[in-house]
Amino acid sequence: MKELHTLRQQIDEIDDQIVELISRRFLITDEIGTLKADSSVPALDEAREQEIISRLREKSESLSVNPDLISSIFRSVLSEVVAKHERIKNQGENFM
């Protein structure tokens, strides 16, 4: 069972890296949200979202990963980003 334990450790390390990368992504998107709020740009950019999903679906297919899974994951991520951008915008409006 040592091999199972070793493989699970590898999975745990990868999961940790995924969470760290998502955190980094959100830090950057927070900056984008602030720029959008300062420039009165809408939080939601449907064309950009579609571009991201399409690019990641292609990437996932090239890596033999289910593109529907990747779409689902990133739609959740993007939904959280838009919600955060709205909160950033609303915070700015409350200070004016």
Model-derived regions, located:
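Domain-level signature for soluble enzymes in the chorismate/prephenate branch of the shikimate pathway
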Residues: 1-96
